[in-house]
C-alpha cells in the first residue's frame, strides 16, 4: 500500500507504515527519507515542501514546518527565514510574501515603514537609510522628502526644524 513498506521482506506479515519524514510508493520494500525543506507525517506516499512563510527549522523532515516571525519571510521549501532588509518592511504581515519597499520620506524597519520625524527628511530617496535633520531656517513635515525654507515673513525663531516657522513679530 502507498505509505507502507514490506520492511521485513515477508509477504505473510503486514507492511509497516513509513515513519514521519519518509514515504513510499505502492509495493515498496523500503521507505525513502524526505529531502530537507520538506516534511511528511506517518504513512504518506510523498513529501510536502514547507509552504512559503514556513521553514524546516531543524532540517528534520519528520517534524512539522514552523512559521516565520514578524518582519521575516521565506519561499516554499526554505530552511531559514529571511529578515526584511533595510528599506523594506513586512507591510502585509504575511511571511509568505517578500518584504515591500518603503516609500520616500520613510525608512524601513522589519515590521513597518516609519515616516521621517518632523524636522527630518529622506534626502536620497533611499528608504534604506535614516532620515537626515533639516538645517536652521528650514522645516520638514513628518514623512518629509525635502526641507523647505521658511516662507517670506516667517523665521525659524527657535532654530528647531521640527517646529513650524513663526511669523515675523518684529515688524
What spans do the regions from the language model cover?
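Disulfide-rich, cysteine-dense extracellular ectodomains and adjacent flexible linkers of secreted
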Residues: 1-171
Amino acid at each position: 500500500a502507498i505509505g507502507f513498506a514490506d520492511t521485513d521482506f515477508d509477504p505473510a506479515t503486514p507492511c509497516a507504515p513509513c515513519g514521519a519524514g519518509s514515504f513510499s510508493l505502492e509495493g515498496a520494500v523500503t521507505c525513502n527519507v524526505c529531502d530537507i525543506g520538506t516534511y511528511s507525517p506517518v504513512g504518506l506516499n510523498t513529501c510536502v515542501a514547507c509552504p512559503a512563510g514556513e521553514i524546516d527549522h531543524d532540517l528534520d523532515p519528520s517534524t512539522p514546518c514552523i512559521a516565520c516571525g514578524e518582519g521575516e519571510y521565506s519561499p516554499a521549501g526554505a530552511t531559514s527565514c529571511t529578515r526584511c532588509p533595510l528599506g523594506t518592511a513586512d507591510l502585509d504581515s504575511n511571511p509568505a510574501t517578500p518584504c515591500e519597499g518603503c516609500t520616500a520620506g520613510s525608512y524601513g524597519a522589519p515590521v513597518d515603514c516609519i515616516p521621517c520625524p518632523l524636522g527630518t527628511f529622506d534626502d536620497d530617496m533611499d528608504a534604506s537609510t535614516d532620515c537626515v535633520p533639516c538645517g536652521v531656517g528650514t522645516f520638514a513635515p513628518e514623512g518629509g522628502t525635502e526641507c523647505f525654507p521658511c516662507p517670506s515673513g516667517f523665521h525659524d525663531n527657535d532654530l528647531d526644524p521640527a517646529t513650524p516657522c513663526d511669523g515675523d513679530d518684529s515688524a
